[in-house]
A protein has these predicted regions:
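Mid-domain Rossmann-like dinucleotide-binding core that forms the NAD(H)/NADP(H) cofactor-binding site
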Residues: 1-43
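Non-catalytic positions within long, well-ordered alpha-helices that form the structural scaffold/packing
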Residues: 10, 31-32, 49-52, 73, ...
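Glycine- and other small-residue-rich loops at beta-strand/loop junctions that grip anionic moieties
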Residues: 18-20, 57-62, 86, 119, ...
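Glycine-rich cofactor phosphate-binding loops and adjacent beta1-alpha1 units
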Residues: 39-105
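A general structural signal for well-ordered alpha-helical segments in protein cores
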Residues: 69, 127-130, 155
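C-terminal substrate-binding/catalytic core of Rossmann-like NAD(P)-dependent dehydrogenases/reductases
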Residues: 96-146
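C-terminal capping/lid region of NAD(P)-dependent oxidoreductase domains
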Residues: 136-145, 156-175
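Conserved loop-to-helix N-cap of the C-terminal "lid" that shapes the substrate pocket in Rossmann-like
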Residues: 149-153
Length: 175
């Protein structure tokens, strides 16, 4: 998700992108996806500020809202926006955002269909737009490894790669 988000933020929205990664190969991957800056997530506030940013307008969390909550509260500008797809294990203190008038947005891909919202057709339009961006090369797939043959062996291998914590990009098993 993060790799595509980097591409969309850079190529579609035209934003300056600060990505987080700790390993050298992950940092290089983020740069290849279009990140302007890549910082180590273990010292997030310090790293972002050393990159020349005291605060930022937008933050997107794909990993762990609890782990990075204090850093996000510190780094977000007044009237900024924070988005997250992660599920907090513990409650987060939304009051910490009030003084800065920060907006917090949860995102779940299936909300429109689950609740039959009035704008449900919007999901169709979003997916069509994503397809167009892929087709015209504005954004590119993040496949980094392809395993041939849908088998128990390949499922175990793919799962092992994910569990290793060293996987970058997507792993595809071709049927």
């Amino acid at each position: 998700v993060g790799s595509i988000a980097i591409q969309i933020a850079k190529q579609v929205a035209g934003l300056t992108v600060i990505a987080t990664a700790s390993r050298a190969e992950s940092q290089e991957w983020c740069k290849q996806q279009g990140a302007d800056f890549v910082v180590n997530h273990q010292n997030l506030v310090e790293e972002v500020q050393q990159a020349g940013f005291q605060q930022v307008d937008f933050i997107v969390d794909f990993v762990d809202v609890n782990m990075y909550w204090d850093a996000m509260v510190t780094l977000i500008k007044p009237q900024g926006q924070i988005g997250s797809i992660s599920d907090p294990v513990e409650s987060v203190n939304l009051r910490a955002l009030k003084g800065k008038s920060v907006s917090f947005h949860w995102e779940l891909m299936f909300t429109r269909s689950m609740f039959q919202t009035e704008d449900m057709i919007r999901q169709h339009h979003i997916l069509n737009q994503a397809a167009t961006l892929f087709e015209n090369g504005t954004i590119t797939p993040t496949i980094n490894q392809c395993l041939s043959g849908f088998s128990t062996e390949n499922l175990k291998r793919a799962h092992g790669l994910l569990e290793s914590g060293k996987s970058i990009g997507k792993i595809v098993i071709e049927y």
